[in-house]
């Protein structure tokens, strides 16, 4: 009911489309690395932040695409059946939570700024008639959850990879099978 009520208001009162949400979704995540490069004190170094960002992004991509193509909710503008959840909002809140986790001890305003940008991204998705309010609300929670899960997974993985007494090796190597190419990672646990 709330989805349709807000959707009706958007269609009735929207003056013009604003496409900046295609870019603002990335601002919080990029800010994590940019602040580190500028020397702002964070919880992890640049390499660790990059790994955390990659892990968060992987969890986000798997969960968003899994849900989009399972639920198949029609977008409010009727263009496609991949409305739920909002991927833009999920990515924005994933980055905002990364900002919060990395810089909350330096200044809580850094994380708050990330959340303001993420919330604005979600609001623009509704305003631009791309998503229902429920898609955006769920996407926000999912983005935060993916980042929190990445932090939980990172600590044990990091300990195993940096065990000084271990003679195990981790290897990254390219592969090509005649049709597909990519990188493979071998981790000895």
Each PLM stretch: what is its role?
Residues 25, 48-53, 111, 136:
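Residue-level signature of transmembrane alpha-helical entry/exit and packing/kink sites
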Residues 1-32, 66-77:
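N-terminal transmembrane-helix/juxtamembrane module of multi-pass inner/ER membrane proteins
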Residues 31-38, 121-124:
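Residue-level signal for alpha-helical transmembrane segments in multi-pass membrane proteins
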Residues 21-28, 57, 110, 114-117:
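Hydrophobic alpha-helical transmembrane segments of polytopic
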Residues 9-19, 42-45, 85, 102-106:
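Juxtamembrane loop-transmembrane helix junctions in multi-pass integral membrane proteins
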Residues 28-33, 94-98:
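Hydrophobic cores of alpha-helical transmembrane segments in multi-pass inner/ER membrane proteins
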Residues 39-60:
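Interfacial segments of alpha-helical transmembrane regions
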């Amino acid at each position: 009911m709330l989805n349709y009520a807000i959707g009706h208001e958007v269609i009735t009162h929207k003056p013009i489309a604003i496409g900046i949400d295609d870019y603002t979704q990335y601002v919080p995540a990029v800010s994590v690395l940019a602040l580190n490069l500028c020397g702002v004190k964070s919880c992890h170094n640049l390499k660790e932040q990059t790994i955390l960002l990659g892990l968060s992004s992987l969890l986000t991509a798997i969960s968003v695409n899994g849900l989009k193509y399972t639920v198949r909710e029609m977008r409010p503008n009727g263009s496609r059946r991949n409305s739920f959840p909002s991927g833009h909002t999920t990515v924005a809140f994933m980055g905002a939570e990364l900002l919060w986790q990395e810089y909350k001890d330096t200044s809580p305003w850094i994380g708050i700024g990330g959340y303001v940008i993420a919330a604005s991204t979600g609001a623009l998705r509704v305003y631009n008639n791309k998503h229902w309010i429920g898609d955006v609300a769920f996407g926000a929670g999912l983005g935060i959850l993916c980042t929190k899960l990445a932090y939980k997974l990172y600590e044990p993985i990091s300990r195993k990879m940096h065990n000084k007494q271990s003679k195990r090796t981790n290897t990254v190597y390219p592969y090509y099978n005649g049709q597909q190419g990519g990188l493979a990672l071998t981790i000895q646990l």
